[in-house]
Amino acid sequence: MTLAQVLPGTTLPLPEEAADNAFSVLTPIFAVSGGGLLLSQLTEMTGLSPTTIQNWVKRGWVSKPVNKKYGELQVARILLINLLRPAMQLDKIAALLSYVNGSVEDRSDDIIPEPALYNMVCAGLFAMERERTIHHEFVITLIGAQLEGYEGPVLGAKERLSDALAVMLLNIAAATLMQQADAIYEQMCPMR
């Protein structure tokens, strides 16, 4: 499995030090942007169209921007959706994220902040790439190690998070394999 050399879900270059805390790459951007990113900045960073992001907000998959700015929680959620959408239907992605963190507008029902979830997904992807495996057993072992010591705010939170991470990592791996298969196909049967 080979991931592009960009920060997952973005068009930004991937620094080597991002392996354990991928979302920290965005900290300087938030520091100079006055508490959030404008839609134009977010579209440039993700490669998504403005209407796509606005549609996700309209559908309730991402909380509304505050003063036209998207904060860290919103950006992390957008990056997660962007990562998952090549191999998963958008309504299933929304349901999966709700399974983890409940209502997008209510932080009190979250079992993990979205930036931390994004970091866990990225760390899992980097480990899968490093070990060159996408076996389900490896993914489960990896998630178990990631969640060691995690105490969720509600009963069953650790199991919910573990299940959701497995679905996310395997879907992203599937998307990567689909891209590789498409590239091979294009070499075999180029468009005429």
What residue ranges belong to the model's regions?
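Basic helix-turn-helix/winged-helix DNA-binding cores
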Residues: 1-101
